[in-house]
A protein has these predicted regions:
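A glycine-rich beta-to-alpha transition motif near the start of alpha/beta enzyme domains, typified by
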Residues: 1-111
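ATP-dependent small-molecule kinase catalytic core of the GHMP/sugar-kinase superfamily
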Residues: 1, 92, 99-151
Length: 151
């Protein structure tokens, strides 16, 4: 069993385990991620968020999101707000940029503990958005995808 320092944050009902690897390199296997996210085996969460240094130094940090099934995924809106607040709080900033699989996301403090994140342009191509039970005959579905698929 390994011991790691982690933080738990909540953003509008989604909860996250945050692991900061900027100082100590911690490699987690897919099974370890699953166990940490499992509410019966570990602290449990919707997603695990890993903080790494941005090697290109264009952003405050490189962020990787993992779903509870252990799979890496794109940026989550609520997770991006939580991690941006975490990063801004430690440096007493009111703006931040995070480098994610979904691109570089800009965040700003809009209140004492409120954060707004520009998630970029949403995907309106419903055939490329993960959905269940849709009809191949449907011509238009009226919803965009602006973040990752949650398991």
């Amino acid at each position: 069993m390994i011991e790691i320092q982690a933080y738990k944050m909540d953003g509008l009902g989604n909860d996250f385990i945050i692991i900061d690897r900027r100082k100590d390199k911690i490699d987690l296997s897919k099974q370890q991620i699953i166990n940490i996210a499992d509410r019966k085996k570990g602290p449990g969460c919707d997603q695990i968020i890993i903080i790494d240094k941005d090697k290109e130094k264009k952003t405050n940090a490189k962020i990787t999101f993992y779903n509870s099934d252990g799979g890496e995924t794109g940026a989550c809106g609520n997770g991006s707000r939580c991690i941006s607040y975490f990063l801004m709080s430690e440096k007493k900033l009111n703006k931040s940029k995070i480098n994610t699989e979904s691109g570089i996301l800009k965040a700003k403090l809009t209140g004492k503990t409120e954060v707004s994140v520009d998630m970029g342009i949403p995907n309106f191509d419903w055939k490329k958005i993960y959905t269940k039970n849709y009809s191949e005959h449907c011509q238009f579905v009226g919803y965009p995808q602006s973040t990752n698929r949650h398991i």
